[in-house]
Regions:
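Structured alpha-helical
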Residues: 1-118
Length: 118
């Protein structure tokens, strides 16, 4: 089975502005970082971060276009490249409406879409 077939919701490759708030894994200080997405889905996003975070850490994602806030959990931290790392964030609950995009994939709105294991 293809990996995309196993996903809970389709990923969209898109650069959207985003604000991330949380606690820095480096010095335990609170951070607020303006950044952008690489991919989004109904279940989270892949973003670029300068601040250091840890797997499992809870952070807040803020959509600056409407000030909507969602809590998420860090599910992936890539290697640091030029001071930035790719960070995967999973919403605690699916939130397809968070992204405010015009043409969301059909599986973002299927009943039970958030129920599978991936």
């Amino acid at each position: 089975m293809e990996e995309d077939d196993q996903r809970r919701s389709e990923r969209i490759l898109i650069d959207l502005p985003l604000v991330v708030r949380g606690e820095s894994a480096k010095d335990n200080g609170i951070f607020r970082e303006e950044t952008f997405t690489l991919t989004i889905s109904a279940h989270g996003a892949l973003v670029m971060l300068e601040n250091k975070v840890s797997l499992g850490q809870k952070i807040i994602l803020v959509n600056p276009t409407n000030s909507d806030e969602r809590e998420g959990k860090v599910s992936y931290v890539g290697p640091d490249r030029a001071g930035l790392a790719k960070v995967g964030v999973e919403f605690l609950r699916p939130a397809p409406e968070f992204w405010q995009i015009g043409s969301a994939p059909p599986n973002w709105h299927l009943p039970g879409a958030g129920q599978s294991s991936r």
